[in-house]
């Protein structure tokens, strides 16, 4: 049971960060706008996107190499702490913060279960 939940969490996390990261790397208009709102250059947002895509790959590879998955998820969690901090600095409401909060909860759940695998 735990393994199937871990696989499901890894898949959800990987898809979310692959899509978000690719959007930042491609500098789609909504990401350019958000970068400007939080005071980041588009280049900085692209680098964050690279980290997100790498983290997504690391979480998936963590299904075969558990310590890698834990490290990747921990790195993504640090990115999310930064994202939540950016939301708070902008005085965003719950609606704007919900995606970041949901992904943070997924990462915490993944880490909780994955620690038992290493």
State where each predicted segment sits.
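Membrane-interface extramembranous regions
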Residues: 1-118
């Amino acid at each position: 049971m735990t393994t199937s939940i871990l696989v499901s969490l890894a898949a959800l996390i990987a898809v979310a960060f692959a899509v978000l990261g690719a959007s930042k790397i491609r500098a789609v208009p909504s990401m350019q706008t958000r970068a400007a709102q939080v005071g980041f250059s588009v280049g900085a947002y692209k680098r964050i996107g690279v980290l997100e895509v790498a983290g997504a790959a690391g979480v998936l590879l963590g299904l075969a190499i558990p310590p890698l998955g834990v490290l990747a998820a921990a790195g993504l969690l640090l990115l999310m702490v930064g994202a939540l901090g950016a939301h708070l600095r902008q005085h965003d409401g719950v609606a704007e913060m919900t995606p970041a909060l949901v992904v943070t909860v997924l990462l915490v759940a993944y880490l909780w279960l994955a620690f038992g695998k290493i």
